[in-house]
Amino acid sequence: MRRASSCGGAVAGSPSEAQDGGEDDGSLRNDTSHMSFEELLELQSQVGTKAYKQLVTGSSTKKQSSRPPVQKGCVADKHRPLEMSAKVRVPFLRQVVPISKKVARDPRFDDLSGEYNPEVFDKTYQFLDDIRAREKELVKKQLKKHRSGEEHEKLQHLLQRMEQQEMAQKERKRQQELRLALKQERRAQAQQGHRPYFLKKSEQRQLVLAEKFKELKRSKKLESFLSRKRRRNAGKDRRHLPLSKE
């Protein structure tokens, strides 16, 4: 309350001072109105042209603002809205309400999705194998209908892709079975009091390759596999040979 009264007193005192100054300027202008032209020229030479014009016209050379002065030190209510100039340009992308940044989350690599266990995953989604088998048979039927053309190429490419995925899944299952067998063997050695032996990755790859050869031999596809491998290795060797000079 004291702050408001002090501000009010400061504002109330300013008009009286302005009124006294206005009366003095009016009396001086009345005096100059009765002076002769020679006296006015002499007065102008004494006080200067700028002061003489201000005295005769009664206006300052500087433009005075018609708005009342802003009392910066006096605040009537601190809870009132902030006054801002209407001439300030509002930004085009003004953010009124803060929006939290969206963070992309991949469930495959997120801890909230749990730890990936291939054995549990295969048991949970085992029904997908039957769906893939039915889709493969459907693609084969469609391939028999379209013997040539662009549709035939698309179906052929799709069938090859499905067969490659099936082979990769079988290979992954074979490796899982091998790891499970090694784990059971180490557990049996520990129960018998022997120190368990952990195979190196190179030894595990050799075991997987041996199992793959056994599977190919049982299915009578070993010769075709070896011939493809020999052709692939021969192509690699030719790339490393120096070019013949003509």
Curated annotation (Swiss-Prot):
Localization per record: Nucleus, Nucleolus
Main location, first listed in the record: nucleus
Extent of motif Nuclear localization signal: 228-231
UniProt keywords, alphabetically: Coiled coil, Nucleus, Phosphoprotein, Ribosome biogenesis, rRNA processing
Modified residues (Phosphoserine): 60, 65
Coiled-coil annotated residue ranges, if any: 144-192
One GO term (biological process): maturation of SSU-rRNA from tricistronic rRNA transcript (SSU-rRNA, 5.8S rRNA, LSU-rRNA)
GO CC terms in record: 90S preribosome; nucleolus
Biased composition (Polar residues): 57-68
Regions of compositional bias (Basic residues) in chain numbering: 227-246
Region (Disordered): 1-35, 57-78, 222-246
InterPro entries (alphabetical): RRP36
Function: Involved in the early processing steps of the pre-rRNA in the maturation pathway leading to the 18S rRNA.
Family listed: Belongs to the RRP36 family.
Protein name as annotated: Ribosomal RNA processing protein 36 homolog
Organism in which the protein naturally occurs: Bos taurus (Bovine)
Gene name as annotated: RRP36
